[in-house]
Amino acid sequence: MAGHSQFKNIMHRKGRQDAVRSKIFSKLAREITVAAKQGAPDPAMNPRLRLAVQNAKAQSMPKDNIERAIKKASGTDVENYDEVRYEGYGPGGVAVIVEALTDNRNRTASNVRAAFTKSGGALGETGSVSFMFNRIGEIIYKPEAGTADHIMDAAIEAGAEDVQSEESGHHITCAFEDIGEVSKTLESKLGEAESIKTIWKATTLAPIDEEKALSVLRLISTLEEDDDVQNVYANFDVSDEILAKLSV
């Protein structure tokens, strides 16, 4: 089984749910503020902000929190955040991409480098692993959103490129530049999604054993706990048997 969303599910089951929720809301709020500051404070006039708000709603972020994050962008004391991407190799040669929004590049780079080094991996240069990934849009709906055929029909009409329906939900992907329009059309047909975001999808996978899987999990967990880190993507491929053991 590929990707690291399965690992994220494990982390959420093992971690304190309130702490996880608070961390997610904090990262969503930062993205909303940055999006609002870079463009218009009206989601209808700002595609990036519209996407950020859609994703926040999909994560059940309270309306007051969303509005407060937007208003913060117009304040005089708002931090200036830089968008930074880090790339490197983790345990077992797993390629890792880290996206961050930071007001202190030196601090974030130091923390990310330390996480890679502690795991036995190494932080590389920009472009060192991203060639093994494609930048795409991903929209996730819960299973109860509809049957696989119904979701497929809606996705095709919306201009999506692929749909994977599983027990955990429906995963719809589209071109990176189309995610705003596709997600908006899908919402009119299926309601609000569980998740809407642009992701790095691995095109080359690195098979790993249980020992390496545990090390990769620790690396991803450490990175995602950093307040500056918004997203982490990895190209590991782990068996269902190992995944089941890790989820115990």
Swiss-Prot record:
GO terms for cellular component: cytosol. It is found in: Cytoplasm. One of its GO terms (biological process) is regulation of DNA-templated transcription. Keywords: Cytoplasm, DNA-binding, Transcription, Transcription regulation. One of its GO terms (molecular function) is DNA binding. NCBIfam families: PRK00110.1, PRK12378.1, YebC/PmpR family DNA-binding transcriptional regulator. Belongs to the TACO1 family. This is Probable transcriptional regulatory protein BT_2363. It comes from Bartonella tribocorum (strain CIP 105476 / IBS 506).
